[in-house]
A protein has these predicted regions:
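Polybasic/polar functional segments that serve as interface/processing modules
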Residues: 1-100
């Protein structure tokens, strides 16, 4: 649902449920991928939203997941990756939402 709301083009979805709990999964999208790993016993989830191009709205996906998990603390960091590494442009990583 997060990928759909973010306007991603979904190619494939693969999830694995661990015993006794927890999941790992990836949503492959035409623009790259979204992945998640959860540790319910620690009330923790790690989510990556990777995108190339300017169609995907990662902030929409992130907001949806924060709401669905009823997260009490979040840390969201936007990172520049990929082709910028070979250019003269400086790479700027910034916290989008500080840990709260």
């Amino acid at each position: 649902e997060a990928a759909r709301l973010a306007q991603a083009t979904i190619v494939d979805i693969v999830f694995h449920e661990f015993n006794p709990f927890g999941i790992s999964g990836v949503v492959v999208i035409a623009e790259s991928h979204l992945s998640i790993h959860t540790w319910p016993e620690y009330r923790y989830a790690a989510v990556d939203i990777f995108s190339c191009g300017d169609v995907l709205q990662p902030e929409v996906a992130a907001s949806y997941l924060v709401e669905q998990f009823a997260a009490e603390r979040t840390s969201i960091v936007e990172m520049q990756r990929g082709m910028f590494l070979n250019s003269s442009m400086p790479i700027v990583n910034r916290a989008v939402v500080a840990i709260r």
